[in-house]
């Protein structure tokens, strides 16, 4: 079977200055980071090349770069009718983003391309960038001994999506020293990422046809390409969100804390991949005139409005032991539910060809493809220069959906154990070693014909929340000053 050998390179550097001036505390920083993904394939061929096909291919690269300059300043001002000072924080930020696609070698994309993953073609390759600037202000104060709160405003200007203003308000009321109520209301804005705007590739995907997965040459097209426009694509719009939360905190003493928080998140114009659009002969011919010989197509679109509601419960208990040893116990539980509030109108060209931009599978991946429940129990034991950490997590059941409900597959809950230990060496060094998924648990294997298995070569679902790679060992060293 084809073997994908990927190389991932992360780079980052941060520098900054901080100080005080005229009663203000200020902090300036400059941050550069990049992530590059390069893909090689082995043990595969390009059937279009026949006997001349190599068995190793370089399929190309994806690279994200980001440079951020940030300047913050804060100070306190006395207010006679408040029990505490008014804290004022202001700031400005400038950000530059760049997204690049690098072409693979010619053998990886010629004809049908290398099996398993066709390389990025020269027509896919290119670099795209944008910049945005923002200013913000945050005010916080303790109005009375029981009531405190804050408000914040942020204004941003994107070079490709114009300007927006978001806001946040929060408040906390202490009924007693041990019991308090807190709440937050905020708005959010997320411009489509550069990858969502410009990612494009032609490769082999699998689509359920007559109840079985069938390999189809599939084009993923950027929304501004002629191919996507021919299938009804429109310019992407920013996602807009509204967030609400309300919670109780109970802390009867310094060693025990419990919090219960309910939340709701509404997202308008949520960006998803369209359905894999199986093209008829007419649409195939139309895309062929634009240089794309494919049997299916997809593109990013503002597909749906969604609502996520849930509750988080977290309890922590600290046990002070002899000789300054300490044991921290944490129990956490999350329950959530996501629903689709609105579905984007189907483009006329798709309706005329009996296709749906957003199908059942696209919707149910939002609503049922992630566990609705997650429970965890963590223990941290610190003694001297040593620390031991253990975490048990239970992921709830989830369903991998298909357009035919009879092909859905539901997976049972699963428990996972992670452990790690660390030691501090001197003032600056810390060594860490650990094992994730100690008991080597795997999710249930794929049984539905509709859920990608490919004759047993891919036996586990990519939707499994704990992955499908089994036990994992790691070690790392850190130096701080």
Q: What are the roles of these predicted feature ranges?
A:
Residues 1-3, 52-61, 120-125, 152-157, ...:
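Extracellular loop and loop/strand-boundary signature of outer-membrane beta-barrel proteins
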Residues 2-14, 19, 32, 36, ...:
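Outer-membrane beta-barrel transmembrane domain signature of Gram-negative proteins
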Residues 20-25, 76-87, 146, 178, ...:
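Short loop/turn motifs that connect adjacent beta-strands in outer-membrane beta-barrel proteins
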Residues 21-23, 32-38, 77, 92-100, ...:
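Transmembrane beta-strands of outer-membrane beta-barrel pores
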Residues 26-30, 86-90, 149-151, 167, ...:
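Transmembrane beta-strands of outer-membrane beta-barrel proteins
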Residues 90, 257-402:
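Gram-negative outer-membrane beta-barrel transporters
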Residues 123-132, 174, 178, 191-259, ...:
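Outer-membrane beta-barrel signature, preferentially recognizing the C-terminal barrel domain
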Residues 267, 337, 392-401, 422-481:
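C-terminal beta-signal and adjacent terminal beta-strands/loops
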């Amino acid at each position: 079977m084809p073997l994908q050998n990927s190389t991932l390179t992360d780079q980052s550097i941060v520098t900054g200055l901080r100080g005080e001036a005229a009663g203000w505390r200020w902090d300036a920083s400059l941050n550069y980071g990049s992530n590059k993904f390069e893909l090689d394939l082995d043990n595969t061929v390009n059937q279009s090349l026949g006997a001349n096909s190599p068995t190793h291919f370089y399929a190309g690269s994806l690279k994200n770069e980001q440079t951020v300059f940030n300047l913050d300043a804060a100070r306190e001002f006395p207010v006679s009718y408040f029990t505490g000072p008014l804290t004022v924080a202001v700031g400005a930020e400038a950000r530059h983003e760049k997204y690049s696609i690098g072409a693979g070698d010619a053998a990886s994309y010629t004809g049908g391309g290398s099996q398993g993953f066709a390389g990025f073609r020269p027509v896919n390759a290119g670099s795209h960038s944008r910049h945005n600037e923002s200013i913000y202000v945050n005010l916080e104060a303790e109005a009375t001994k029981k009531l405190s709160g804050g408000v914040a405003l942020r204004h941003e200007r994107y070079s490709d999506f114009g300007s927006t203003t978001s806001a946040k308000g929060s408040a906390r009321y202490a009924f007693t020293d041990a019991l308090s109520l807190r709440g937050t209301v905020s708005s959010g804005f997320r411009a489509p990422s550069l990858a969502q705007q410009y990612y494009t590739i032609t490769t082999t995907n699998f689509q359920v046809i007559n109840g079985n997965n069938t390999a189809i040459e599939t084009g993923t097209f950027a929304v501004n390409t002629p191919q996507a426009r021919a299938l009804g694509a429109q310019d992407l719009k920013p996602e807009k969100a509204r967030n609400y939360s309300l919670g109780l905190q109970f802390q009867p003493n310094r060693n025990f804390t419990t919090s219960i928080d309910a939340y709701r998140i509404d997202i308008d114009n949520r960006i998803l991949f369209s359905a894999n659009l199986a093209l008829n002969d007419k649409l195939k011919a139309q895309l062929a005139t634009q240089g794309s010989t494919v049997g299916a197509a997809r593109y990013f679109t503002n597909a749906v409005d969604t609502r996520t509601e849930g509750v988080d419960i977290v309890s922590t208990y600290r046990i002070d032991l002899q000789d300054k040893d300490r044991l921290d116990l944490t129990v956490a539980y999350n329950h959530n539910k996501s629903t689709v509030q609105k579905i984007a109108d189907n483009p006329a060209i798709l309706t005329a060809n009996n296709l749906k931009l957003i199908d059942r599978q696209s919707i149910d991946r939002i609503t049922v493809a992630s566990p609705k429940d997650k429970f965890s129990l963590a223990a941290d034991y610190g003694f001297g220069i040593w620390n031991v950490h253990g975490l048990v997590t239970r992921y709830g059941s989830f369903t991998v959906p298909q357009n035919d409900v009879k092909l859905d597959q539901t997976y049972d809950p699963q428990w996972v154990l992670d452990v790690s230990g660390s030691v501090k060496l001197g003032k600056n060094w810390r060594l860490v070693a650990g094992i994730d998924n100690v008991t080597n648990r795997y999710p249930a294997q794929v049984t539905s014909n509709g859920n990608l298995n490919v004759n047993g070569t891919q036996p586990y679902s990519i939707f499994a929340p704990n992955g499908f790679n089994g036990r994992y060992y790691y070690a790392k060293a850190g130096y701080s000053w």
